[in-house]
Regions:
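Conserved P-loop NTPase "ATPase switch" module shared by AAA+ and STAND
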Residues: 215-220, 230-283
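Active-site signature of alpha/beta-hydrolase-fold catalytic machinery across serine-
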Residues: 227
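Mixed-charge (Asp/Glu-Lys/Arg
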Residues: 1-218, 255, 280-281
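Hydrophobic positions on the alpha1 helix immediately C-terminal to the Walker A/P-loop
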Residues: 223-224
Length: 283
């Protein structure tokens, strides 16, 4: 199955870069992408209010993947209309602080279309200041998002795309909260359910298992899942998707990025999602 045409594409992200919100949210997008890319550790990225602090915009260690080189990665981000001007400014600032040759990899990332990004990076690599220099523009990000569907759904929701068939568990919770006359905190749904909460987390840590919840109504079960993950494991919460249509289920089950898939329709193909030849998702 191909990519979902309703999810954010390169043009959507380029337009989003014009918004004030993107300045603080783009680093969060990068943090989520890195967190869901296998072989990436030591992630430290400032987002939202933290972007004004000095130092690198982000750091991480990579074992190497389809989208990242192997090594110590040092990130600079820019949502500016002129990505090359921002990249030059950031590169020059960092290069001045290098004594000898750095063993770090300089990575500039922009949600803009940057036609000359590859040639810019090649020229900078030839200077030999850093171990390597990379430049990622919106088209590289689009491909990366397609391989990390939980992040793809999240950013699509953030920029207002009318996604269907699935949504992040966090988005589902926010919709429920807005529709309630009385605001109920997430922890309300785990009150008196300590053993059940621990049991759910245990099941989600095992390969090839299906977590079955029984509740008086579907929303209660989903709210319980959200509250447990919110309290126990943000990383798992960011991978959790509520799937409402069989087509979306099949699409997500075929993806290589590990997900927590929560079906809210009848007779989902559980075996497809648990297929270890691709990626054993959690259900």
């Amino acid at each position: 199955m191909g990519t979902n045409p309703l999810l954010a594409n390169a043009l959507d992200l380029d337009r989003w870069a014009d918004t004030l919100e993107s300045r603080g949210a783009f680093p969060e997008l990068m943090r989520r992408l890195l967190a869901q890319t296998p072989g990436v550790t030591n992630i430290d990225i400032r987002a939202h209010e933290g972007i004004a602090a000095s130092g690198w915009d982000g750091t991480a260690t990579s074992d190497g993947s389809s989208f990242l080189p192997k090594g110590e990665l040092r990130f600079e981000f820019g949502t500016n209309k002129d990505p090359q001007a921002k990249a030059n400014k950031d590169y020059n600032t960092r290069a001045k602080k290098v004594t000898g040759k750095s063993d770090e990899i300089f990575v500039f990332v922009t949600p803009r279309n940057w036609l000359n990004g590859a040639s810019w990076a090649k020229k900078r690599r030839q200077e030999g200041v850093f171990a390597s220099v990379e430049a990622y523009d919106v088209h590289r990000l689009e491909g990366w998002l397609q391989s990390t569907p939980a992040v793809h759904y999240w950013i699509s929701e953030q920029i207002g795309k009318p996604v269907s068939g699935a949504q992040t568990l966090t988005s589902w919770w926010e919709q429920l909260r807005r529709n309630c006359k009385i605001e109920v905190p997430p922890e309300f749904h785990t009150a008196g359910r300590h053993n059940e909460s621990e049991r759910l987390m245990q099941l989600l840590s095992r390969d090839g298992t299906v977590s079955a919840l029984q509740a008086a109504w579907c929303n209660d079960a989903l709210a319980f899942c959200h509250a447990v993950l919110l309290q126990a494991d943000d990383a798992k919460l960011e991978r959790a998707l509520v799937v409402s249509e069989p087509e979306a289920w099949r699409y997500l089950a075929m993806q290589g990025s590990r997900l927590i898939m929560i079906p809210v329709f009848d007779n989902p193909d559980i075996g497809l999602a648990l297929n270890e030849r691709r990626q054993c998702h959690r259900v």
